[in-house]
């Protein structure tokens, strides 16, 4: 058993380009924010260890590029994910309309029982908001997944979003005494070398 943590969960951030996936990850992992973040090329990841119900959970969070040309690269990351966070921009109706396409990608590539979370980012831009909270909440309720509005800029609900996902995965694992099917994600106290927290960026 690794003494550093009890669980290792792999999370994936997906959604249209420019919705703030990288900013959400920066805020959660490093508690920083930048207006001029460069578009993600391919995939990047960061790690943060959290405590939940007395258990230490290491979250390995993969940030994927939203552009179509990177879709074949990023689709391979779906399979091993325990949780997938679908992000849209509350000031961009099209990014919300495209959520259905991203959910279809999850159905196509991810494990059958993967946990999902819908996040409407940039909630601080109240004057530019076009996606109604109630409409998004109703959509999330209809498909049976949690929903939160966040702001990476002022940190609203960012912590809660990732912790909600961690709790959902942990609860699912606790209610699953049957071992996962071969090829599916396996959550256990992991073997191997501890991952260096100091530098987890790909580039």
Curated annotation (Swiss-Prot):
The record's annotation in PROSITE patterns points to: RAB
Q: Which residues bind GTP?
A: 15-23, 33-40, 63-67, 121-124, 151-153
Per the record, GO CC terms?
plasma membrane
Molecular function via GO: GTP binding; GTPase activity
Cellular localisation: Cell membrane
Q: Where is this motif: Effector region?
A: 37-45
Keyword Electron transport attributed: no
CDD domains in the cross-refs: Rab1_Ypt1
Query: Record's Pfam families?
Result: Ras
Alphabetical keyword list = Cell membrane, GTP-binding, Lipoprotein, Membrane, Nucleotide-binding, Prenylation, Protein transport, Transport
Q: What is its main location?
A: membrane
The name on file for this protein is GTP-binding protein yptV1
Q: Which organism is it from?
A: Volvox carteri (Green alga)
Q: Which gene encodes it?
A: YPTV1
């Amino acid at each position: 058993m690794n003494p550093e943590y009890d669980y290792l969960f792999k999370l994936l951030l997906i959604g249209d380009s420019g919705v703030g996936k990288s900013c959400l990850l920066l805020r959660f992992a490093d508690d920083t924010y930048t207006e001029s973040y460069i578009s993600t090329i391919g995939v990047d990841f960061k790690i943060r260890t959290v405590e939940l119900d007395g258990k230490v959970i290491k979250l390995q969070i993969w940030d994927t590029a939203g552009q179509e040309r990177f879709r074949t690269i990023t689709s391979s990351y779906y399979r091993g994910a325990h949780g997938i966070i679908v992000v849209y921009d509350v000031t961009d109706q099209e990014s919300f309309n495209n959520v259905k396409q991203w959910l279809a990608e999850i159905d196509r590539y991810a494990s059958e029982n993967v946990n999902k979370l819908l996040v409407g980012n940039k909630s601080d831009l109240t004057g530019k908001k076009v996606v109604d909270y109630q409409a998004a909440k109703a959509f999330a309720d209809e498909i049976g997944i949690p929903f939160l509005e966040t702001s990476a800029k002022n940190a609203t609900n960012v912590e809660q979003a990732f912790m909600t996902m961690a709790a959902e995965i942990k609860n699912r694992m606790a209610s699953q005494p049957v071992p996962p099917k071969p090829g599916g994600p396996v959550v256990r106290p992991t073997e191997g070398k501890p991952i260096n927290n100091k530098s987890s960026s790909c580039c």
